[in-house]
């Protein structure tokens, strides 16, 4: 689920010839630094769990072991950390939020009265968007940084891995490309699947 938030700090401001320690830009930057060091918890759904289980069969060595490990009831922390260091796998393992824009101040010689940053999140299907907002607030650890959704989210549950459909895909794949493994994957980008699922079409 695609969801963006404005993070904003307001301040009385002033003139740069009389600087103060309480600076909207500094406060926002410190909050963003804390957010950058925060990871949402590991959360696999049916699709991502199957993805890592089947990808493990194609990988070798430590990568194969790590992919198997993250699908276990008690995932190995080292395996989670190693996969999380790879952006394409990290985005499959958890909800992600990242700062993408910053705006502040109005003049070279004026202390900023506002500083704000756009944070874009990719919320795992089935996870509460409001819960993600509350998690961001806790990660920022500063009640002077407001967190406001840019627009209402369009939540969606994950697409089910329908065994009947999957078997048909595997059968045809086997006929045309013998030995090819079918691996379901969850896109971290937006797709029309969101609207189809909400219309009752899996």
Regions inferred by a protein language model and the residue ranges of each:
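C-terminal catalytic subdomain
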Residues: 110-132
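Hydrophobic, small-residue-rich alpha-helical packing segments that form membrane-like cores
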Residues: 1-3
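An extended, acidic, His-containing surface patch that forms the Zn2+-binding/catalytic region
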Residues: 46-106, 113, 130-134, 146-202
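A short core secondary-structure module
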Residues: 12, 16-42
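Short amphipathic alpha-helices in soluble, non-transmembrane regions
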Residues: 22, 31, 132-140
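Predominant activation on well-ordered alpha-helical scaffold segments within soluble catalytic domains
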Residues: 6, 26-33, 96, 170
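A common structural junction motif
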Residues: 35-39, 137-145
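A generic structural motif
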Residues: 11-17, 106, 121-128
